[in-house]
Swiss-Prot record:
Keyword field: 4Fe-4S, Iron, Iron-sulfur, Isoprene biosynthesis, Metal-binding, Oxidoreductase
Residues binding [4Fe-4S] cluster, per UniProt: 12, 94, 188
Active site residues according to the UniProt entry: 124
Protein name: 4-hydroxy-3-methylbut-2-enyl diphosphate reductase
GO molecular function: 4 iron, 4 sulfur cluster binding; 4-hydroxy-3-methylbut-2-enyl diphosphate reductase activity; metal ion binding
Enzyme class (EC, first level): oxidoreductase
UniProt-annotated binding residues for (2E)-4-hydroxy-3-methylbut-2-enyl diphosphate: 40, 72, 122, 160, 216, 218, 260
Recorded metabolic or biological pathway in which this protein acts: Isoprenoid biosynthesis; dimethylallyl diphosphate biosynthesis; dimethylallyl diphosphate from (2E)-4-hydroxy-3-methylbutenyl diphosphate: step 1/1; Isoprenoid biosynthesis; isopentenyl diphosphate biosynthesis via DXP pathway; isopentenyl diphosphate from 1-deoxy-D-xylulose 5-phosphate: step 6/6
Length: 280
């Protein structure tokens, strides 16, 4: 059985940067926490906990020490609270997410109604929305644009892990409503390239494994695009979840991983597939 690992599987720039900053902060002799999980990888969060860095839901219990801002960013009022408490802030927000936050702030301040393309329940989107005024709307598709109030000036940004196709659909609907429209493509290049590579790989193989946290939006999206082309697609978080029965009658297996999946998890998955391969 041949196994092909996607070239761009694993950490993206923003996640790599955030984890590096978190582990560096963990090595200092200070009371250190992350505001929310640093990335959507339970394994990385656990490793940080073992080093004494716990994830907090809010800042209520903190009156001193270091707070690390998660890669997805946080709400503007939480940054303000950390500053008001004079906490030492390590801002590990992904630069692409930061750019989306800045665009929303600028658009709102100049009188635009803002449309954020993304998942309203995702912490990245909730953080982005907080930088705008009272005319910020989250839509998951072009259809949802039709439910929005009429606005003369519309600004559009996207959650960094959205598909370009979905952004185009939303913009198309906005254009049909008339008025002035400004669009900022805040989709991370790594996300788009990773999805295209995963699609190409899914077309070539008999079975596809997508590795990453079940709470990771970009990993779930990878699994979705792969499943559209290869029905035998399995989203797993660790090597322990692999079922040897998946590979019955399979000549070629493809493996990709989300942007928040650490290399050691990918290595364990590849090792487990190798073990199954030897037995067969």
């Amino acid at each position: 059985m041949r196994v092909i690992l996607a070239k761009r599987a694993g950490f993206c720039f923003g996640v790599k940067r955030a984890t590096q900053m978190a582990f560096e902060a963990a090595g200092m002799d200070k009371k250190t926490y992350t505001l929310g999980p640093i990335i959507h990888s339970p394994q990385v969060v656990k490793k940080l906990e073992e080093m004494g860095v716990r994830a907090l839901k809010d800042l209520d219990s903190m009156d001193s020490g270091t707070i690390i801002i998660r890669s997805h960013g946080v709400a503007s009022h939480e940054i303000a609270e950390a500053m008001q408490k004079k906490l030492e802030i390590v801002d590990a927000t992904c630069p692409f997410v930061k750019k989306a936050q800045e665009h929303v702030k600028s658009l709102s301040e100049t009188g635009y109604g803002v449309v954020v393309v993304g998942d309203a329940d995702h912490p990245e989107v909730q953080g982005i929305v907080s930088y705008g005024g009272d005319k910020v709307f989250v839509v998951g598709s072009g259809e949802e644009v039709r439910k929005l109030p009429i606005m003369n000036k519309i600004g559009v940004v996207a959650q960094t892990t959205q598909s370009f196709e979905n952004l185009k659909n939303v913009v198309s609907e906005c254009l049909q409503r008339g008025g002035e429209i400004r669009v900022f493509n805040t989709i991370c290049d790594a996300t788009a390239v990773r999805q295209e590579e995963a699609k190409e790989l899914a077309r070539q193989v008999d079975c596809m494994l997508v590795v990453g946290g079940f709470n990771s939006a970009n990993t779930r999206r990878l699994a979705e695009v792969c499943a559209e082309l290869q029905p035998r697609t399995h989203h797993i978080e660790t090597a322990a979840e692999i079922d040897p029965a998946w590979f019955e009658g399979v000549a070629t297996v493809g493996v990709t991983a989300g942007a928040s999946t650490p290399k050691w998890i990918i290595d364990e998955v590849m090792g487990r597939i190798g073990e199954i391969n030897k037995k067969n």
